[in-house]
A protein has these predicted regions:
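Short alpha-helix
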Residues: 89-111
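A short SAM/SAH-binding and catalytic strip from SAM-dependent methyltransferases
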Residues: 18, 31-44
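C-terminal lobe and adjacent flexible extensions of AdoMet/dcAdoMet transferase-like proteins
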Residues: 104-238
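A short glycine-rich, Lys/Arg-flanked "PGG" loop and its adjoining helix->strand segment in the class I
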Residues: 46-61
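Short, glycine-/aromatic-enriched active-site segment of Class I SAM-dependent methyltransferases
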Residues: 68-88
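A short acidic, Gly/Pro-enriched loop at the edge of an enzyme's catalytic core
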Residues: 7, 19-33
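Short, conserved SAM-binding/catalytic segment
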Residues: 1-9
Length: 238
């Protein structure tokens, strides 16, 4: 009623992220799954990614934010209830996250946004020592045929516009801001993320893609633990 609907358009289902298979959810029926900083609290993180992949339609997406560490967290810190409750000691090592995501079937994980977490509390800082943490918003697509590296097939896209909130510039990830009406060269993986998903109606493709030109230049993922430009963003305190 508050949003002007005559009948409810939302269904709430109680369950556990690690046990989505126990819920009455149809495999391959979801266009989009969203999660906000809760996967790090799950004890069986690979199960979460496997279940999400199973539930998504081909071309579907897991869009989520979470906290990651620049190394594997020692077992004694994982057991610390304060650190765990602060979403720190349950954080996946960044390299393990990428391996877990790809093992679940999500090729070429993308970073949408990231910022380092500044540990300001003296007691927490003493416990974590030199471990660095980052808050990352990521997107994972359920797509067949994504390659291990970004490959150049001489193709580009033109953004037509029309995505709500991104009328002038479409942000796929931290490395791809696509201006409306401009020819934008893309690698094969990025092309698939645009043309084999719900975004396809908003793009035109330039090039047949029948010739390989080697690695696509400048398509490396960002260092999520690197210092950020303080003029434009800031680290989140803990």
């Amino acid at each position: 009623e508050a949003f002007g609907y005559d009948t409810p358009n939302t269904t709430f289902i109680e369950g556990e992220l690690e046990k989505l298979d126990e819920l009455d959810l149809e495999a391959g029926s979801f266009d989009l799954i969203i999660s906000n900083c809760v996967i790090n609290l799950c004890s069986d993180k690979p199960a979460v990614f496997r279940a999400a992949h199973r539930l998504l339609k081909p071309g579907g997406e897991l869009y989520f934010s979470d906290v990651y560490a620049d190394r594997r967290i020692p077992a004694e810190l994982v057991k610390d209830p304060v650190l765990y409750g602060e979403c720190l000691s349950g954080a996946l090592y960044w390299g393990d996250y990428q391996a877990v995501a790809m093992a679940a079937g999500f090729g070429d994980p993308r970073v949408v946004d990231h910022r380092p977490l500044a540990i300001l509390d003296p007691e927490l800082k003493a416990k974590v020592g030199q471990i660095r943490f980052a808050s990352v918003t990521a997107r994972l697509f359920k797509l067949e045929g994504l390659e291990p590296a970004c490959e150049d097939y001489g193709q580009a896209v033109i953004y037509r516009g029309g995505v709500e909130g991104m009328e002038d510039v479409f942000i796929l990830d931290a490395e791809h801001a696509i201006e409306q009406g401009r020819v934008f060269p893309v690698c094969g993986n990025t092309l698939a993320m645009l043309m084999e998903t719900r975004f396809a109606a908003h793009f035109d493709v330039v090039g047949a893609g029948d010739r390989h030109f080697g690695l696509f230049p400048g398509c490396a993922a960002p260092d999520v633990f690197a210092a950020v430009d303080t003029a434009s963003t800031s680290a989140a305190p803990v």
